[in-house]
Amino acid sequence: FSFHHRTDWVNNTLSYGSGYASAFIEWASNVADTKFRFSEQAVRLLIDYYLDGICKQMVYGRISDPGILNRDITRPGEERVWSSSDPEKLRNLTDYRQAELDNIICLRKGDSSCRPGSFAKFFWRTDHFVFQRPDFYTSVRMYSTRNANMEEPYNGEGLMNHFRGDGTNYLSVRGDEYKRLTPVYDWMKIPGATIVQLDKMPGENEIQKWGLTDYVGAVTDGTYGAVGLDFKSPHTGL
């Protein structure tokens, strides 16, 4: 599961996509004991989206994967620990995948007795690959002819995001390694990306570009995986 707010198919799972889920979670919780309650099938779909879409694009299900941030990377607090409110509400709706919801709740509350799970997942519509073990989380952000590299700099945010989709590979052990990095970031030295070092960054109208190659692909059995990208920079031709 992934969420796309616009026709550029940029990954918005943890921005608009989380708000989308939260609205349904709130109403499912509000009407749970009435004749308007959501069907079990609908609740299960919502839980699947929350656990397999939202939580698996987060470091240990607690903190946003820095690799999927768009213009919101410039906002203070994006490295915060997410609230346990939504998974708690979901847990009260059904016993479906309850152990996994309990683990997310426990992790977000900072209980040291909880251990993050292990998984490898490819979000094929988003061209995003994630890999987690109990002691680290890493991801690879890519794009192809099917989607754009980055969100437009709406509201004057993310003005230096030109190269952040170019195979970016962030590694997190605690989850807060990139906290408050944005003001001092070298935007032409992005982890995992091969970037031509320019004299100055292109203008803000040159941030969003569509991929020039078709191939981004991965194989995974849910625990192990491999991912590949046929990359050609739409900014520099590299």
State where each predicted segment sits.
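Extended polysaccharide-engagement surfaces of secreted carbohydrate-active enzymes
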Residues: Y20, W27-L238
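Active-site lining segments of carbohydrate-active enzymes
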Residues: F1-R37
